[in-house]
């Protein structure tokens, strides 16, 4: 996860989003596929985590809470990570709202994606069989005067410490283990993610 934003060179082509047509008493009604899935309380977090994406995801969660505060929300994650502040706005909303947020990793959940994956409701965090998870410490690149660089370096160390504390809380690992294991990029398979405490089980097929 990065301390400052990075441009996603593989931004999705929204023209390729399929439409779903439903018959209603008033005739046909068409939705884009993601809006239709939102009716089923399914949200997708795909691509780099950045401010625009975070705004959309938090808005969807708040909308679903307003519709029904008792029903679970399902957050599907396929992300290489992204900006810490954007990710933390999603994290705080997940913890703030009344419905449980079930997280499901498909493809990959790396960096901030992994952090959000493990932040789901206990017992409701899943990986699909061939997905992968990667955890590491926050990344930062700064330029400018030496004093400013020092200020940013101190801030990123504070962010690192806070995120390690939260990871320890959600995984059940000790803070020392989290600090050691995130010192470098650490990749985990779906099964290893269960063993580590990042998720609760591997989804192979719907019941």
Swiss-Prot record:
List, alphabetically, the GO terms of the cellular component aspect.
cytoplasm; endopeptidase Clp complex
Q: What does this protein do?
A: Cleaves peptides in various proteins in a process that requires ATP hydrolysis. Has a chymotrypsin-like activity. Plays a major role in the degradation of misfolded proteins.
Q: Which InterPro entries match?
A: ClpP (IPR001907), ClpP/crotonase-like_dom_sf (IPR029045), ClpP/TepA (IPR023562), ClpP_His_AS (IPR033135), ClpP_Ser_AS (IPR018215)
Please tell me where this protein is predominantly located. Answer: cytoplasm
What is any one GO biological process for this UniProt entry?
protein quality control for misfolded or incompletely synthesized proteins
Name the encoding gene, please.
clpP
Any idea of its EC number? 3.4.21.92
This protein's source sits in the domain of life called Bacteria
Q: What name does UniProt use for this protein?
A: ATP-dependent Clp protease proteolytic subunit
């Amino acid at each position: 996860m990065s301390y400052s934003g990075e441009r996603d060179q593989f931004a999705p082509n929204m023209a390729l989003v399929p439409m779903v047509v439903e018959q209603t008493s008033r005739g046909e009604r068409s939705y884009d596929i993601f809006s239709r899935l939102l009716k089923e309380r399914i949200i997708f977090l795909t691509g780099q985590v950045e401010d625009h994406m975070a705004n959309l995801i938090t808005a969807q969660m708040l909308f679903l809470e307003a519709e029904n505060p008792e029903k679970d929300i399902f957050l599907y994650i396929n992300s290489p990570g992204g900006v810490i502040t954007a990710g933390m706005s999603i994290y705080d909303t997940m913890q703030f709202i009344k419905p449980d947020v079930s997280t499901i990793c498909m493809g990959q959940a790396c960096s901030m994606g992994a952090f959000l994956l493990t932040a789901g409701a206990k017992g409701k965090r899943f990986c699909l069989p061939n997905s992968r998870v990667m955890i590491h410490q926050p990344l930062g690149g700064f330029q400018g005067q030496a004093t400013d660089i020092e200020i940013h370096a101190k801030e990123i160390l504070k962010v690192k410490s806070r995120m390690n504390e939260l990871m320890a809380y959600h995984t059940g690992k000790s803070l020392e283990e989290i600090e050691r294991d995130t010192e470098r990029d650490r990749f985990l398979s779906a099964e290893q993610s269960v063993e580590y405490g990042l998720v609760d089980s591997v989804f192979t097929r719907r019941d």
